[in-house]
Structures are given as C-alpha cells and as structure tokens.
C-alpha cells in the first residue's frame, strides 16, 4: 500500500475516535462545576485536569487501535470480528460518559462500564487472533477502564443518595 493510504487511514482512525472523545470531554467538562464536583470521590481519583488529559489519551489509543485493526485487513473474517467488537466497545465507552456525566446515573454507568470491560476483553481476545499489534494500544485502555470502573463503584458506594437511573425529574 502507498504511504498516503496509510496516512489517510491513520487520520481517519484518529478522527473516528476523537469525535466521540470530544463528546466525552464535553460531557465531563460541563459536569465539573455542578454535579461532579459535589460528589464524594475516593482519594485515588486524580484532579480534573489529569482526568481531562487521560480522556484524550484513551481516545487517541483507541484511534491507534482502530488504525492497526484496519491495516490488518478487514477482508479477513477474524479481523472484521475484531473491528466490530472494537466499535461496540467504543460505543459502550461513550455511553458510559453519557450515563455518568449527562444522566448523572452513577450506578447505571457502573453497569455500562462493566459491559464495556467485558466487550473489550472479547475484543482483546479477538485482536490477539487477528491483529496482535493492536493489543499494544488496547491494553492501556483496558487498564484505565478498570481504574475508572473501580472509581465508579467507589463513587456509588460513597454517595448512597444518588438516583439509580439518573437525574430525577
């Protein structure tokens, strides 16, 4: 393949993941002054600035994962399966941001994050069968998601008065 083709794929992959990342950042930053700042959080939750950059890092790594899967050849059924699982994982991650920061549904977001982790593990297994290099970028995302999930659980436990399914109208 031509170098331009790879460059185009890299840009497309990063943009495809950074657009949902922008949505996640928007949801995070708009909830900081209100709901999120009022939550009791465990001591290991980093400052809002660090979380901001961690979100960017996660979505950049997801973009590199997508690029690597794409370059493995979507015509192969194993790679296509990894690609579809990856898209499902990306969708669940964005849905977690919507659930947690927009709907303010910490318990529901915890369920979504557990689902995202389960699908990401399936994605990782599929990637190891078809596009091994993509695992380099996906494993740090999985580690960050496990930390987020644990923080989410602690927030649910520390803020017992939160509505289970989100904002109460």
Go through the PLM ranges and name each one:
Residues 1-15:
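N-terminal membrane topogenic signal
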């Amino acid at each position: 393949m031509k170098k331009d083709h790879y460059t185009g794929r890299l840009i497309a992959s990063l943009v495809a993941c950074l657009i949902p990342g922008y949505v996640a950042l928007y949801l995070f930053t708009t909830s900081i002054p209100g709901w999120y700042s009022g939550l009791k959080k465990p001591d290991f939750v980093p400052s809002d600035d660090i979380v901001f950059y961690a979100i960017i890092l996660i979505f950049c790594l997801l973009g590199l994962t997508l690029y690597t899967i794409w370059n493995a050849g979507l015509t192969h059924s194993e790679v296509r399966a990894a690609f579809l699982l990856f898209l499902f994982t990306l969708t669940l991650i964005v849905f977690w941001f919507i659930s947690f920061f927009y709907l303010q549904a910490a318990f529901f977001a915890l369920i979504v994050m557990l689902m995202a982790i389960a699908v990401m593990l399936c994605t990782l297994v599929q990637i190891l069968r078809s596009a091994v290099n993509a695992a380099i970028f996906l494993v740090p995302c999985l580690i960050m998601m496990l930390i987020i999930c644990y923080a989410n659980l602690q927030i649910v436990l520390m803020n017992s008065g939160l509505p289970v399914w989100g904002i109460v109208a």
